[in-house]
Each structure stands twice: as structure tokens, then as C-alpha cells.
């Protein structure tokens, strides 16, 4: 998979690209990442990429020319229009989710445009962007951090990147359930014990415990996810047990 990142601050990505899962994926050539410095496509001798907004208003707006010229350069690649999508990260976009990460990870090529200042000229959004994405209802200085979120979440879903494919499958949100609690050694720390069942060696009981704890945590913290979840027969049975154990929790099981 190839990922283009169009930004005014390419240096912000250096640490991310050299570290952890993304760094290993790049080293093993499972993904390739191209950082495009939008300033390099400015026609202004001072590399200016912003200007005052028409109609007045606070702040500056990213000019269309450098972004269009940068995109023109990307489009020269034969692979650009083959299973490719351009996304713009903005608070006005569609909420980002694990489902969207899965969708983007299936592309051959993903182009991420990072905004800055008060945003970009509307003509960029209308003619260069396929989809606008928001990573949350808050405002950041620029689109670089959201782009890193997308880069990380998409990279880990590329086949072979994690090594153990089950790691991605059991991540929170992967199946509209939050992940079950995790424990490691020591078995007892400051009087706090690991649940005995996890050390029992009984794989069937352990699997049931994990499923039940996952359901319990989702019901407690993100009940909205259960509206999207189709429970298996086992999950339905476990959810009934959970509701009996927690009478203060209300859930219409017939909807699931």
C-alpha cells in the first residue's frame, strides 16, 4: 500500500515513520509513504501558501494553487487512479472509525491532505478531495496529528504488518466490542491478583471469560456500539447473564 501525505510540516512525521509498527512496515516494504511538502509547490518567491479570506474574517486560508500543483504532480504516477482515494482531515468531516480504517486499508493508494490555518480554499475541497474525515469533535492546530492517526490505524490493518493477524481482529471496535481486560506477569502485584481463570489453562473457559468481559466493558463504556452489533448465540447468552448480574443496566436484547 502507498500513502501520500500532503503537509506544510513534513518534519512532524519523521519520528512516526521511524518508530514501532509503521517503521517496521516501511522497512519490510509492506507500505510506502511519500511526504509532500506543499510549500515546494508555491509560486511565491517566499514560498507563501496562505492568504486573507475573501469577505473578511479571522485568520488565513491555504491557497489553492500549491495544493492543485502538488496534486498534479501526484497524478503523473500511473498508479494514482487505481483504487486510490484522497481524504482531507478536518473537524467538519465524517467521524473516523475502525470501519473507515478497514475501508482505507483496502486501497492501493491513499492520499491524505493536511489543512492548516483557518482551512483550505473551498475549491480544493470541491475538486480534489474524495472524502473529508474528522478524528473528533475538537480543533487542532493542523491536520498532521489526525493524519498520523489515520496512518497508524490503516497501517496495522495491512495484511502481514502485525505478524499475528489475530491481534488486529481482537482490537477494540473491530467487531463493535471493546477489548477484554489484559493482564501479564506477575500474577500478584501489591496484593492485586490476576483473575484465576486466566491461569487455569482451560482455553474454552478462558475464551468465554474474554467474550463476557468484552461484552460487559462495551455495555458499561460504549453501549452505543451494541446497536451495531449482531450477537452470536453465545454472546446473547452471556449478555443475559451480564444483565442479571447488573440489574441497573438496561438493554433491549431483541434489537441485537
UniProtKB/Swiss-Prot annotation:
It catalyses: guanosine(37) in tRNA + S-adenosyl-L-methionine = N(1)-methylguanosine(37) in tRNA + S-adenosyl-L-homocysteine + H(+). GO terms for cellular component: cytosol. S-adenosyl-L-methionine binds at residues 115, 135-140. The keyword Signal does not apply. Belongs to the RNA methyltransferase TrmD family. GO terms for molecular function: tRNA (guanine(37)-N1)-methyltransferase activity. It is found in: Cytoplasm. Its EC number is 2.1.1.228. NCBIfam families: PRK00026.1 (NF000648), trmD (TIGR00088). InterPro entries: Alpha/beta_knot_MTases (IPR029028), tRNA_m1G_MeTrfase_C_sf (IPR023148), tRNA_m1G_MeTrfase_TrmD (IPR002649), tRNA_m1G_MTases_N (IPR029026), tRNA_MeTrfase_TRMD/TRM10 (IPR016009). Homodimer. This is tRNA (guanine-N(1)-)-methyltransferase. HAMAP family: TrmD. Keywords: Cytoplasm, Methyltransferase, S-adenosyl-L-methionine, Transferase, tRNA processing.
Amino acid at each position: 500500500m502507498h500513502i501520500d501525505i500532503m503537509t506544510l510540516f513534513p518534519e512532524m512525521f519523521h519520528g512516526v515513520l521511524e518508530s514501532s509498527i509503521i517503521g517496521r512496515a516501511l522497512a519490510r516494504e509492506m507500505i510506502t509513504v511519500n511526504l509532500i511538502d506543499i510549500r515546494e509547490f508555491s509560486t511565491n518567491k517566499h514560498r507563501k501558501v496562505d492568504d486573507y479570506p475573501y469577505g473578511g474574517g479571522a485568520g488565513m486560508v491555504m491557497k489553492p494553487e500549491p495544493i492543485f500543483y502538488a496534486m498534479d504532480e501526484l497524478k503523473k504516477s500511473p498508479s494514482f487512479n487505481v483504487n486510490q482515494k484522497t481524504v482531507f482531515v478536518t473537524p467538519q468531516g465524517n467521524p473516523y472509525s475502525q470501519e473507515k480504517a478497514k475501508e482505507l486499508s483496502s486501497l492501493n493508494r491513499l492520499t491524505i491532505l493536511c489543512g492548516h490555518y483557518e482551512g483550505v480554499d473551498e475549491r480544493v475541497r470541491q475538486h480534489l478531495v474524495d472524502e473529508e474525515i474528522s478524528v473528533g469533535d475538537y480543533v487542532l492546530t493542523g491536520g498532521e496529528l489526525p493524519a498520523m492517526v489515520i496512518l497508524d490505524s490503516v497501517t496495522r490493518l495491512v495484511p502481514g504488518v502485525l505478524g499475528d493477524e489475530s491481534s488486529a481482529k481482537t482490537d477494540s471496535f473491530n467487531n463493535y466490542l471493546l477489548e477484554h481486560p489484559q493482564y501479564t506477569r506477575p500474577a500478584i502485584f501489591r496484593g492485586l491478583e490476576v483473575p484465576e481463570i486466566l491461569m487455569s489453562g482451560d482455553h474454552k473457559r478462558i475464551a468465554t471469560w474474554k467474550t463476557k468481559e468484552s461484552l460487559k466493558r462495551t455495555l458499561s463504556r460504549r453501549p452505543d456500539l451494541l446497536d451495531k452489533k449482531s450477537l452470536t448465540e453465545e454472546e446473547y447468552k452471556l449478555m443475559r447473564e451480564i444483565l442479571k448480574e447488573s440489574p441497573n443496566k438496561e438493554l433491549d436484547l431483541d434489537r441485537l
